[in-house]
Design a protein with these regions (language model features):
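Extended, well-ordered protein cores
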Residues: 1-134
């Protein structure tokens, strides 16, 4: 098992870097576990194998959905995203399949995040401390 330690709940850059290395090495999703926070002595997993001759390719649309979904609080979001990008290497149009179960979950996570962002913009108002509100 390869264990990837991400710095925080929203460490998208760390996930992207790890996912790129894993894809280059051809590591299957079942061998990867993503964790939040620092590793301990007992969390040490297998090292990432050396890269092969592949070049990972992901559509901009899929990458946008993944980046939004990674902001969700679902504990399996990082594993789901890696599973999808791994599959996208052999199924480049996976993001266009509305019946794909992984894409259905990813889109639901992204939709939830977008809805929360909208609610924050629409309903949360800030004012300076010390000013009297209406």
């Amino acid at each position: 098992m390869i264990r990837i330690a991400l710095a925080s709940q929203t460490d998208i850059a760390g996930w992207r870097e790890a996912a790129r290395k894993l894809l280059l090495a051809g590591v299957i999703p079942a061998r990867v576990e993503f964790n939040i926070g620092t590793e301990t002595l007992f969390d040490e997993g297998d090292p990432i194998p050396p890269p092969g001759d592949r070049t990972p390719v992901i559509s901009k649309e899929l990458l946008g959905d993944i980046q939004t979904a990674l902001l969700h609080s679902d504990p399996e979001r990082f594993a789901l995203a890696y599973r999808i990008v791994f599959r996208a290497q052999t199924q480049p149009k996976i993001h266009q399949n509305p019946a794909d179960p992984d894409m259905h979950i990813l889109r639901a996570l992204a939709k939830s995040v977008r809805r929360d962002i909208h609610k924050m913009h629409a309903f949360v108002r800030f004012r300076k401390v010390g000013e009297r509100g209406d």
